[in-house]
């Protein structure tokens, strides 16, 4: 409030000012580019499949014990709330650097375990320590996400914020593809190089992103005043660049290449990643000093609700529509206790007692989380089907289609008013490919089915991961989204353990102790290994049935929340009509 008062004293009423001057314009776009870089190189959990077999061999553990390590990484996300606690006592850039250092230490320990255990038998790292560093690594990923989320919230108004968040989160899905390109260029036959990159690249990109982040901190509140028309053009350009980047990685990231060709492909990918830098430069040159027509609805006061803007006519209309909806639907079991309006704040206690939350929780738990577990097991799946040589391609496919799924999560905001489908309807539609993929891989376990199934799983889970924050905000209140979303994602470690345990038990039950030569490293190790379709056939069938449950849950959620979205849309139309008539 004090900062806002100073801004008004120095520059007058914010309503008489533009959507941020030249400096504010390029700074907020520079911040967005910084979050894109951070997200693109900090999704280190997505390349677990690239080194999981080697880690299993080095530690001499079973598939079940390996599953515990994957669960530890996902369990770290349950401690994501600690990032919010850190932000209460530390500046944002300090939290970013601390996160990078923690991630560096966690992956450095795993790298030492993988490298030295292969060559020096006397050197061992205790399994509990490896479990702990996997947990820390998973927690650091969640902290990176929080930093990017906060930066987008601080830098963009409510009208532009969903597009900024969607773009930033989308690039997290490309991490595995970028890491694969780096690994192919540096040492394509060594799984350990992924762990080395996991340690170094997030730290490097955090340091690189510091200047725009520090500039963001020095700004007042005036830069929050958006320019919808200008922003729309800039976002269109950024989304085009993002789409080209994703297509580039799909086309070139799937090939087995020579070292020199790999460096050329990597250079091209880095150029595309740097290309959004032209936006801040162009924004400062072509910025039009046009007032924001939606300025009265902007959020200059950080203590005000993010999305609750009700005028008196809105409140009257809302109550009238609530009575109508309750009268028409009150007798249906499906509608009992459902949400009536969007953006209504839910405390944690109220959230736990809300039927719609548990439908949403089930849809996530039986949908996107299954996709995440699939990506963790992709290394063993490829190995069991004699597709180990195609693992790099499969990682690139999963990563790229996860990216496109995340990118598509912006459709509800881009098509707002043109295609009035509730966001929960988009969520249900996104879950449709998931059971199709698992049943396809259950019936036909070969290279082509594996590639198609991996693409569908990546597309579906990517959309849900990116859309989840917006869905949580709309259904249960924007000001409670931090707490409520952290409650939601407790399903990730639970699902990681449960679904991973199913896969591990089926794998170990059908496997046998044998000497296996890794085609990538040439090292022969004695371990429990399973080869053939029997290793994951039952798992694919069970995962398919589970995702059908998630799809059914999302459809019920859509059915229950559709009237609430209709109420909000009608209120928005009424507001626009009232403004025009006045």
Regions inferred by a protein language model and the residue ranges of each:
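Hydrophobic core of transmembrane alpha-helices in multi-pass small-molecule transporters
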Residues: 106, 119-144, 449-463
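C-terminal ends and interior cores of transmembrane alpha-helices
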Residues: 101-123, 249, 253, 433-445, ...
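Intracellular juxtamembrane helix-capping segments at the cytosolic ends
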Residues: 48-51, 55, 141-167, 179-180, ...
């Amino acid at each position: 409030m004090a900062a806002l008062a100073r801004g008004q004293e120095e520059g007058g009423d914010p309503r008489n000012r533009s959507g941020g001057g030249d400096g504010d314009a390029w700074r907020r776009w520079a911040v967005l580019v910084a979050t894109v870089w951070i997200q693109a190189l900090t999704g280190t959990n997505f390349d677990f499949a690239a080194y999981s077999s080697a880690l299993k061999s080095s530690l001499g553990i079973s598939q079940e014990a390996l599953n515990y390590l994957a669960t530890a990484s996902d369990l770290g996300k349950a401690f994501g709330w600690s990032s919010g606690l850190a932000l209460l006592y530390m500046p944002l850039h300090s939290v970013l650097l601390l996160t990078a250092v923690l991630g560096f230490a966690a992956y450095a320990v795993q790298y030492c375990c993988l490298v030295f255990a292969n060559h020096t038998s006397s050197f061992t790292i205790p399994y509990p320590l490896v479990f702990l560093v996997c947990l820390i690594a998973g927690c650091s990923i969640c902290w990176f996400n929080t930093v990017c989320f906060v930066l987008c919230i601080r830098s963009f108004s409510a009208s532009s914020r969903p597009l900024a968040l969607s773009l930033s989160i989308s690039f997290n899905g490309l991490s595995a593809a970028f890491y694969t390109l780096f690994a192919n260029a540096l040492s394509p036959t060594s799984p350990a190089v992924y762990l080395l990159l996991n340690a170094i690249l997030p730290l490097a990109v955090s340091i690189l992103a510091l200047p725009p982040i520090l500039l963001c901190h020095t700004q007042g509140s005036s830069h929050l005043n958006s320019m919808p028309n200008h922003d729309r053009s800039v976002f269109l350009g950024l989304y085009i660049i993002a789409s080209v980047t994703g297509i580039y990685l799909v086309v070139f990231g799937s090939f087995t290449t020579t070292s020199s060709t790999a460096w050329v492909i990597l250079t091209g990918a880095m150029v595309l990643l740097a290309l959004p830098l032209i936006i801040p430069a162009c924004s400062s040159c072509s910025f039009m000093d046009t007032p924001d027509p939606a300025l009265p609805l902007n959020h200059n006061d950080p203590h005000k609700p993010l999305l609750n803007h009700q005028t008196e006519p809105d409140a009257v209309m809302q109550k009238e529509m609530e009575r109508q909806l309750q009268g028409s639907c009150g007798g249906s079991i499906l509608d009992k206790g459902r949400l009536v309006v969007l953006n209504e704040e839910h405390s944690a206690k109220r959230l736990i007692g809300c039927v719609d939350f548990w439908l949403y929780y089930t849809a996530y738990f039986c949908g996107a989380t299954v996709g995440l577990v699939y990506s963790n097991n992709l290394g063993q799946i490829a190995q069991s089907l004699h597709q180990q040589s195609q693992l790099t391609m499969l990682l690139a496919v999963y990563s790229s289609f996860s990216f496109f799924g995340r990118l598509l999560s912006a459709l509800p905001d881009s098509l707002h008013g043109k295609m009035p489908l509730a966001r929960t309807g988009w969520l249900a539609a996104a879950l449709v490919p998931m059971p199709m993929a698992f049943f396809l891989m259950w019936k036909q376990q070969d290279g082509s089915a594996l590639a198609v199934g991996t693409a569908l799983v990546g597309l579906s889970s990517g959309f849900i991961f990116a859309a989840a924050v917006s869905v949580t905000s709309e259904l249960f209140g924007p000001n409670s989204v931090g707490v409520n979303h952290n409650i939601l994602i407790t399903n990730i470690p639970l699902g990681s353990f449960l679904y991973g345990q199913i896969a591990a038990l089926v794998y170990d039950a059908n496997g046998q102790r044998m000497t296996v030569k890794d085609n990538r490293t040439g090292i022969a190790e004695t371990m429990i290994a399973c080869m053939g379709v029997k290793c994951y056939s039952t798992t694919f069938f069970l995962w398919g049935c589970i995702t059908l449950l998630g799809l059914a849950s999302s459809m019920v959620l859509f059915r229950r929340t559709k009237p609430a979205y209709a109420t909000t849309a009608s209120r928005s139309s009424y507001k626009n009509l009232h403004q025009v008539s006045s």
